Amino acid sequence: ESYKFNSSIQEVENADAILLVGSNPRWEASVLNARIRKTYINNNCKIGIIGPDLDLNYSYTNISKSLIGLNDILENKTEFSKDLYSSKNPIIIVGTSAINTNQGASILKVCGEIAKKLPNFSKSFNPLNILNQDISRVGSLELGFTNNNFDGDFEIKLKEEIKKNKPVVFLLGLDEINFKSLDGSFVIYLGHHGDINAQHADIILPTPAYTEKSSTFMNIEGRVIQTSRCHHPLGEAKE
């Protein structure tokens, strides 16, 4: 799928070539980054990046600071692409910062075409991996929570939607958006941290933290994980 870490996190340790596209695993997924460093040391793994220079704890080749460099890899015009296509267990890791743009669909398409040219691509193994930064993104997409009306610049389109329809907005623990984008709407906040958007909500419904309830989660691989409650919810929080 185009939103999961398809090859599995464990398989990273077997990789002998890794292409990072718009992703900083040291910042976005430290455990995954530790596995990348491990395969770099043990397998002499070649690592190439598309994007700005990064402060990583292993050596890499910066193929291009622009996403245009993906086409050069697809057409095998770079030294790293030769390593990528000649390796036995290559993988591609794409960050959501690269695909959450107006060009995201095109970027994902090119990455998919590169993946199909890799030697280990098959019906049973997909070397193309999406590294989601939002912990609940994979589970939400698996349940079918999608809305193409907000593709591209999310906050601009959100402002347009609120200005047009004056809706009731439910914020399910969401704190990353600018609260000014919600002006003109009736905001109901469900969450447990009480960050800035909770302070501007019309109604606050406190919910338990993940440590305060037994739940089912889905990791970036799309694998189901179950947790057990450590203690009862505090204050007025309710499931």
Walk through the language-model features, giving the residues of each:
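Non-catalytic alpha/beta scaffold blocks inside enzyme catalytic domains
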Residues: 1-239
